[in-house]
Amino acid sequence: ITGHTVEVGVEKIAVVRCNGSCQNRPRPRTYDGARSCAVAAMMNGGETGCFFGCLGCGDCVKACKFDAIKMDPETGLPVVDQDKCTACGACAKACPRQIIELRNKNKLDRRVYVSCVNKDKGPVAKKACDAACIGCGKCVKACPFEAITLENNLAYIDFEKCRLCRKCVDECPQHSIMAVNFPPKPTENN
């Protein structure tokens, strides 16, 4: 009826695909206008040097009717409360940079994903953000399941093929690939 397809029985969650925290990216400009991501994106691209990442004004927070997303004052990035998120998609629709995606949850709610949407070439992306994917391809080579491809200087993970082995996380020199809800890896002392 609505024209949308729904996967029956597949629970989803909102995922923020930006790791460009206050510590990771320079702020070469000062945005003095309305505190709105939509306005900042139209005016001067916001305060950071990354024209792909989070603008930090919280349009996603304002859009969420379930109080499931908050701005982290330390990082300046939105954080999703996994227990409150209903995967309604309001936050994703509110983001002018399209950094929020709805992803399938698995039984243990473990996820591996690229926390960057910057499509600039390596040196340009790295200058904009210390955590930017630079399209080096190390993750592609490390993945034994051929679940990762490079497209427009950015790594993409095929979640149908990914087996959550986290070899890509270990190989990423930029720490652009995130692993969520995994137990800590054993250290040499354990």
Region annotations inferred by a language model:
Residues I134, K138, P144-Y156:
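Strongly charged, low-complexity linkers/loops
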Residues R166:
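Terminal recognition/anchoring or ligand-binding modules at protein termini
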Residues I1-C136, V140-A142, E171, H175-N190:
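Ferredoxin-type iron-sulfur electron-transfer modules and their immediate structural context
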